[in-house]
């Protein structure tokens, strides 16, 4: 999420940008500081609302998964526009804009923007050489970004071990 938000911030040059994050999110906080981005730390959602009331931003870009309706409604009392990213929670229905680049749904409101047309790519990816497409699958890599609280990695690994017996020519990494 941090890299996504940094990419967005880099592309909003000329705008006053401030990152607000919970102080316990140390790796993300460190990355923002390394990127020389202005950062304000908070301890709770309540403290965030107090900060927003005081700072009075024009737009809040909220990169939180599964927001609750009450949270977004409260935020909209103090902010002109609320944008949420990768948000499938009920709160997203109350945001002004929802950008869900990782999902292809299209069944929710007009404030939703779905799919790969809305991905924020870092500059490094524009320079990358596309991989050669192989008709025959030879290698499979499964990567879940960030944390894995549902232990999907282990579940996928166990499935790959079972599949590998039927397809010994495929390498799982």
Predicted regions and their residues:
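Histidine (H) residue identity feature
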Residues: 1-4, 25, 40, 106, ...
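Histidine-anchored nucleotide/phosphate-binding helix
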Residues: 1-13, 154-161
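Active-site and donor-binding regions of nucleotide-sugar-utilizing enzymes
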Residues: 4-11, 21-112
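A general structural motif
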Residues: 14, 56-57, 79, 137, ...
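Short internal beta-strands
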Residues: 16-24, 170-173
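Generic structural signal for beta-strand residues in well-ordered domains
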Residues: 75, 91, 133-134, 165
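A nucleotide-sugar donor-handling region in carbohydrate enzymes
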Residues: 94-151
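Donor-nucleotide binding loops and adjacent catalytic segments primarily
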Residues: 135-173
């Amino acid at each position: 999420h941090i890299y996504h938000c940094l990419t967005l911030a880099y592309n909003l040059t000329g705008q006053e940008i401030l990152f607000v994050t919970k102080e316990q999110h140390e790796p993300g906080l460190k990355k923002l500081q390394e990127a020389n981005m202005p950062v304000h730390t908070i301890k709770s959602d309540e403290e965030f609302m107090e900060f927003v009331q005081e700072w009075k931003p024009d737009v809040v870009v909220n990169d939180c998964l599964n927001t609750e309706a009450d949270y977004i409604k409260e935020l909209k009392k103090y902010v002109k526009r609320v944008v949420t990213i990768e948000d499938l929670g009920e709160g997203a229905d109350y945001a002004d804009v929802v950008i869900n680049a990782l999902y292809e749904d299209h069944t929710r409101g007009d404030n939703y923007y779905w799919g790969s047309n809305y991905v924020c790519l870092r500059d490094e990816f524009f320079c990358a050489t596309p991989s050669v497409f192989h008709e025959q699958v030879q290698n499979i890599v499964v990567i879940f970004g960030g944390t894995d609280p549902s232990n999907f990695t282990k579940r996928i690994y166990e499935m790959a071990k079972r599949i590998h017996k039927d397809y010994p020519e495929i390498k799982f990494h």
